[in-house]
A protein has these predicted regions:
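A short, structured active-site edge motif that brings together acidic residues
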Residues: 43-44, 70, 125-140
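Conserved H-loop
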Residues: 37, 125-129, 157
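Short, acidic loop-to-helix structural element flanking the phosphoryl-transfer center
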Residues: 81-106, 112-116, 144
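Conserved Lys-Pro-Asp/Glu-containing loop-to-beta segment of HAD-superfamily phosphomonoesterases
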Residues: 7, 143-171
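Active-site neighborhood of HAD-like aspartate-dependent phosphohydrolases
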Residues: 1-46
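Acidic, Mg2+-coordinating phosphoryl-transfer loop and its flanking beta/alpha structural elements
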Residues: 162-201
Length: 220
C-alpha cells in the first residue's frame, strides 16, 4: 500500500475509546495494592506518562523494576477488563472516522489479542486497513517502535502519516517516523500539557480530523 497520499493512524485507548474513567479506576487498584495513594482523573491526566513504570514509581514514591511492573501490569489489566463493557466510543468517533478521505489504520498499546475482537464488537473493523495492538505479555512501553512496525506492515511511508492520539508519546512516535501528530484533549493527558507540546490540539475528534487534513495538505 505504498502511497504518497496521507494515511491516518488512530490511537485507541483515550482517543476512539472513551475509557479514561476506567483506566484511572484500574490504576488506583494498582496503587492501593501497594498501600499507595489514589489519584483523581485530573491528577492522572497531569502526571501520566510512558514508560508507565516511571509514572507508577513517581506516585508510589518507590522504584518499580521490571519484575514489579509486570506484576502491577497484570493487576491493572485484570481490573480494567472487569469494566470494559461499560466503555463507549468517543461521542463523535464514527463521524470523525467517516470524515477522513484517505486510508486509516488503528495502533494501540493494548494487547493485540484483546484489541482485535473489541474493535470488531464496536463495528469498526471495516474502517481500518490494519489493526495492531501490543504483541507482548507486559505493556507500558513507548509507541515509536510499534508505529514503525505498523507502517512497515502497511508499506506506508512515515512522512505521509498523521497520527491522532491523546498523549505526548503519540506525538513522539509520529515524529520518530517522520510523520505528524494531532493531539486530542479528551483522553489521558491534561490539555495544558498537550498545548505546550507545540503540536496541533483538538477538543473533539471531528476537529482532530480537520486539523489532520490541514497538516497533511500543508506537507504536500
Amino acid at each position: 500500500m505504498n502511497t504518497a497520499h496521507p494515511h491516518l493512524v488512530w490511537d485507541w485507548n483515550g482517543t476512539l475509546l472513551n475509557d479514561l474513567s476506567l483506566v484511572v479506576s484500574a490504576t488506583n487498584v494498582v496503587f492501593t495494592s501497594l498501600g499507595g495513594p489514589t489519584v483523581t482523573l485530573d491528577e492522572h491526566r497531569v502526571r501520566f506518562r510512558r514508560p508507565i513504570a516511571e509514572y507508577y514509581a513517581e506516585v508510589l514514591g518507590q522504584a518499580v523494576d521490571d519484575d514489579e511492573f509486570g506484576r502491577l501490569d497484570r493487576i491493572f489489566h485484570d481490573a480494567y477488563r472487569t469494566g470494559l463493557t461499560t466503555c463507549e466510543l468517543a461521542a463523535d468517533a464514527r463521524t470523525a472516522m467517516a470524515a477522513w478521505p484517505g486510508s486509516q489504520s488503528l495502533l494501540s498499546m493494548w494487547f493485540h489479542e484483546e484489541l482485535v475482537p473489541t474493535v470488531h464488537t464496536y463495528g469498526l473493523t471495516g474502517h481500518f486497513t490494519r489493526v495492531d495492538g501490543l504483541r507482548e505479555t507486559v505493556g507500558g512501553g513507548r509507541k515509536a517502535e510499534s508505529l514503525q512496525l505498523h507502517l512497515a506492515e502497511l508499506d506506508v511511508d512515515g512522512a505521509s502519516v498523521v497520527l491522532i492520539g491523546d498523549s505526548i508519546d503519540d506525538a513522539d512516535a509520529a515524529l520518530a517516523v517522520g510523520g505528524r501528530a494531532v493531539l486530542y484533549t479528551g483522553g489521558f493527558t491534561d490539555p495544558a500539557r498537550l498545548r505546550a507540546s507545540g503540536h496541533p490540539v483538538a477538543d473533539t475528534l471531528t476537529d482532530a480530523v480537520r486539523l489532520a487534513r490541514e497538516v497533511s495538505s500543508a506537507d504536500r
